[in-house]
UniProtKB/Swiss-Prot annotation:
It comes from Shewanella woodyi (strain ATCC 51908 / MS32). Its main location: membrane. It catalyses: alpha-ribazole + adenosylcob(III)inamide-GDP = adenosylcob(III)alamin + GMP + H(+); alpha-ribazole 5'-phosphate + adenosylcob(III)inamide-GDP = adenosylcob(III)alamin 5'-phosphate + GMP + H(+). Its cofactor is Mg(2+). Its EC number is 2.7.8.26. This is Adenosylcobinamide-GDP ribazoletransferase.
């Protein structure tokens, strides 16, 4: 029972950190627990994707599919508070508007959104809607699978960067700093097991190719972030999640045609 309660605590901490869903009052959060909660980020993706898929399924019973997709996207934004979208915008602003590493990190930390961030945010949301809408034209039921797989695998991929890259912020004000410390093989194995299980249960014939595509994207993003800022930040993890989610939808659409 103690082990189960401990794992539930870690799951609820991950849920509270990455969503707007409130944690139970008995859950106590500290740096060490948040660090270990990294293992359940994939499950948080499964939760968010499941909520989006449920909203899509309910609304498409009485609304056009395109409108249902918009409601599903809104549900994801409400549940997460636009946490990862904010990271995408900040990353675009930092990498696009800064010359030195220090400038890029300073711009990323600025809460104001710039031109690059606004463009990345608008284009990302538009592309997400278009890809899901095209999937729905081929098979409306496939959108459910896409939402669950996309949200889960993208978070696993984003979290995996922590295990192979250096955290480049040294200020204690960063909310992501505890995630960058003392990661173990256990966290990585649980993350990967979540991805494999969700992909296998989805029954997608192109599941292996999706996994390979995400691995290639991961290498590309690691190279980009290392070249630009020397490692990763919480914002680049958010950007990674968004780009990986879009990549999942794009590959699913390609395999469906």
């Amino acid at each position: 029972m103690h082990v189960l309660r401990q794992q539930l605590t870690l799951f609820f901490i991950a849920m509270g950190f990455f969503t707007r869903i409130p944690m139970p009052t008995w859950v106590k959060v500290d740096g060490e627990s948040l660090n270990k909660a990294n293992r359940y980020f994939g499950l948080i993706g499964l939760l968010v994707g499941g909520i989006c898929a449920l909203v899509y399924e309910i609304t498409r019973g009485f609304l056009p599919v395109s409108v249902s997709i918009i409601f599903a996207m809104i549900a994801g934004l409400v549940v997460t508070g636009g946490f990862h979208e904010d990271g995408l915008a900040d990353t675009a602003d930092g990498l696009g508007g800064g010359w030195s590493v220090a400038d890029k990190l300073k711009i990323m930390k600025d809460s104001r959104i710039g031109t690059y961030g606004a463009l990345a945010l608008v284009m990302g949301l538009m592309l997400k809607f278009i890809l899901l809408s095209e999937l729905a034209l081929y098979n409306p039921d496939l959108v459910v699978t896409a939402l669950i797989v996309g949200h889960t695998l993208s978070r696993v991929m984003a979290a995996s960067l922590i295990f192979s890259q250096s955290y480049v912020r040294d200020d204690d004000s960063s909310k992501s700093k505890p995630l960058a410390q003392n990661q173990t093989v256990n966290e990585l194995l649980i993350l990967l097991a979540t991805a494999v299980l969700v992909l296998w249960c989805s029954g997608l014939s192109g599941g292996l190719y999706i996994a390979i595509g995400l691995v290639l994207l991961r290498w590309g993003l690691i190279y980009l972030f290392h070249r630009q800022i020397g490692g990763y930040t919480g914002d680049t993890l958010g950007a990674t999640q968004q780009l990986a989610e879009l990549a999942c939808y794009l590959m699913l659409l390609g395999f469906s045609l």
